[in-house]
Regions:
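Short, structured coil segments at secondary-structure junctions
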Residues: 27, 66, 125-126
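Hydrophobic alpha-helical core bundles mediating ligand binding, dimerization, or RNAP-core interactions
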Residues: 44, 61, 65, 84-85
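Acidic, PIN/NYN-like endoribonuclease modules and their adjacent C-terminal/linker elements
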Residues: 105, 109-133
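Short, well-structured N-terminal submotif of metal-dependent ribonuclease cores
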Residues: 1-33, 46-62
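A generic structural signal for short hydrophobic patches within well-formed alpha-helices
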Residues: 7, 38-41, 78, 122-123
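Active-site neighborhoods of divalent-metal-dependent phosphate/nucleic-acid chemistry enzymes
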Residues: 69-114
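Histidine- and aromatic-rich ligand-binding microenvironments
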Residues: 2-3, 33-34, 97-98, 119
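Short, hinge-like loop/turn segments at secondary-structure boundaries
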Residues: 48-52, 88-90, 132-133
Length: 133
């Protein structure tokens, strides 16, 4: 399950992220992008000062997104993400998850698939496998 942080690293041509992408393409492991990640990435596009820069990044995101299947936010995912977000917020010891991160984590937990991210907040989610690069 792709996190926004990893998608951004791929867009930035991060060597470690590209190496992980090549490694994953050689396996039968599905690489999926939650629609919450698409929303978060495009929110970033809306914050770019120069339209030419936003257009270039939009094209890159479109290319990256075409190469992966997407995961919709179903009611089941929304419920799991909401409970997870509340649990993390109520904890004195666990990292806080933003809204998109709780959705990404919920997808990983419900599907039993790892999340690809260097975001340390995911490490505090009980039962979630996190793959770093």
């Amino acid at each position: 399950i792709v996190d926004t942080q990893y998608l951004g690293a791929l867009a930035d041509q991060n060597a470690a992220a590209r190496e992980k992408a090549a490694e994953l393409s050689d396996t039968a492991v599905p690489v999926r992008v939650p629609t919450a990640v698409v929303w978060e990435a495009y929110t970033g596009l809306g914050n770019i000062a120069f339209e030419s820069d936003a257009t270039a990044l939009r094209r890159l995101y479109e290319r990256l997104l075409r190469s992966h299947s997407s995961l919709e936010m179903t009611p089941e995912v929304a419920k799991r993400a909401g409970e997870l977000n509340g649990t993390q917020m109520n904890s004195d010891t666990r990292s806080q998850l933003d809204g998109a991160d709780s959705v990404v984590a919920a997808h990983g937990l419900l599907l039993g698939e790892p999340v690809i991210s260097n975001d340390s907040d995911f490490r505090d989610v009980e039962g979630l496998e996190v793959v770093t690069y």
